[in-house]
């Protein structure tokens, strides 16, 4: 697998939301530590749902508690957002990020009010697990397993679950319930993406919004791509993030050597 493709698809500029969000998260972290403790108004509390505190319910992914917390979340979510944004559009991806935050917060608050009423959470790692679950569903339809070593493979669909528990072991202070809820939402989004589309604004609304803010979109620097609604087609089939000869694996063993297959021009997700 070509890891570079996760960050900078060949011959393509960086995606606008992925870059902008990374910069914004960093700026908020600096403001919180140097200017004003903004995290006090962003961290999600289990009682936030019952107080109808919309700031905390939707904005808690923006709050980070340490530099390493910020660094690992920016690095892990960047590639996921790049891939999703390229195939779904910048504005639509922003809507999805907000929906994921809200629909993760609701069950977290319900569970947390009973089991851990005094625990606050923040950070974008829930987004990472949601997108990880989403891409695992899509990838599992192309590759049923991922090669870990030359002799050991792991089911593609359950790889995020393994990573969920590894993360809990390596970072015991992280929110396992929040990550698990985010992962379940990602699985749901991958399995029922047409259902998710029904709770997002219609395409014509997104196009209208982009028309209104077009002067601002045109200010985006060269080398950073804003994927407009008119440029994307969310009905296109998923393309594996694995490149070259690994892009498809057989689902069963065969005793006869496979005949050479035509190697067409591959494309990165969303092209």
UniProtKB/Swiss-Prot annotation:
One of its GO terms (cellular component) is Golgi membrane. Gene3D superfamilies: Rhomboid-like (1.20.1540.10). Its EC number is 3.4.21.105. It holds the Pfam family Rhomboid. It is a multi-pass membrane protein. The active site is at 125 (nucleophile), 179. The chain crosses the membrane at residues 16-36, 64-84, 89-111, 115-137, 152-172, 176-196. Probable rhomboid-type serine protease that catalyzes intramembrane proteolysis. This is Rhomboid-type serine protease 2. It comes from Kluyveromyces lactis (strain ATCC 8585 / CBS 2359 / DSM 70799 / NBRC 1267 / NRRL Y-1140 / WM37) (Yeast).
